[in-house]
Amino acid sequence: MLKIGIVGCGAIGNFITKKVLDGTIKNAKISAVYDRNFDKAKTLSERTGAKICSSIDDLVKEDLDLVVEAASIKAVEEIAEKSLINNKDVLIMSVGALADKKLFLKLRDLAKTVGRKIYLPSGAIGGLDAIKALRLGEIEEVVLKTTKPVAALEDALKNLGYKPEDIKNPVIVFEGDVFKAIKEFPANINVSVTLSIAAEFPAKVVIVADPNAKLNKHELFVKSSIGTLRVCIENVPFEENPRTSALAAYSAVRLIRDLAEPVKVGT
């Protein structure tokens, strides 16, 4: 039985809990929860019987196999570091935090030292198994073009000086490297960091705001000395949080489910 602790009892934390309770994730249980908002943690606890923890320190001392970070980019370092030090594997949803190379290397080296694992879901994109194989050759180019409804990008657009209501046609609102992309669109473009980590190559990112779009669209291009990969995925927005894709939540569910299963498919 896989014993799970959840840090962050919002949309993703609730979705994972739902999939444990309905049997989609088999041989697993939610054992402990923590959120700065006590009421959110209480709601999850009442549904699962999980212990409500008073802090991250409290949670990582519980008898857990896996800690799920579903909180925020800012919380990743504390959650991941304390989980690993306390001999827990950790699943990171806010992958954008790992655009900070120093943090990525710090957590990677810590996991190696303590003999634990850091899991990064594929999120709203596909093809990562092929990309990991392609990087065994020489990666030459990695490009991610993301198109989302204006409403999904609204907060970031306002911060950049756009008036979302004035966008009547598709417009490129960002073009640059993965590091700048995650700073300007922290709630929308975690996949660019996941892609860059998989390729071990910094992605060029293009973000398009489309007032007519109903789906979140990701177009990947990866060129390697071994071959070239093109992938296009159109995702339904996540109902509980339209800034991201439903596939991002389901990818975490699938990863956790695989951890509890005896057969692993794919690279």
From Swiss-Prot:
Record-listed E.C. numbers: 1.4.1.21
Pathway assignment: Cofactor biosynthesis; NAD(+) biosynthesis; iminoaspartate from L-aspartate (dehydrogenase route): step 1/1
Class of this enzyme: oxidoreductase
Catalytic activity: L-aspartate + NADP(+) + H2O = oxaloacetate + NH4(+) + NADPH + H(+); L-aspartate + NAD(+) + H2O = oxaloacetate + NH4(+) + NADH + H(+)
Any one GO MF annotation of this record: oxidoreductase activity, acting on the CH-NH2 group of donors, NAD or NADP as acceptor
Binding, NAD(+): A124, N190
Key word Iron present: no
Gene Ontology process terms (BP): NAD biosynthetic process
Keywords from the named record: NAD, NADP, Oxidoreductase, Pyridine nucleotide biosynthesis
Keyword NADP in record: yes
Pfam families: Asp_DH_C, NAD_binding_3
Transmembrane portions of the chain: none
Active-site feature positions: H218
NCBIfam families (alphabetical): NAD_NadX, PRK13303.1-4, PRK13304.1
Family: Belongs to the L-aspartate dehydrogenase family.
Other noteworthy facts: The iminoaspartate product is unstable in aqueous solution and can decompose to oxaloacetate and ammonia.
Function recorded in the entry: Specifically catalyzes the NAD or NADP-dependent dehydrogenation of L-aspartate to iminoaspartate.
Protein name per Swiss-Prot or TrEMBL: L-aspartate dehydrogenase
Organism: Methanocaldococcus jannaschii (strain ATCC 43067 / DSM 2661 / JAL-1 / JCM 10045 / NBRC 100440)
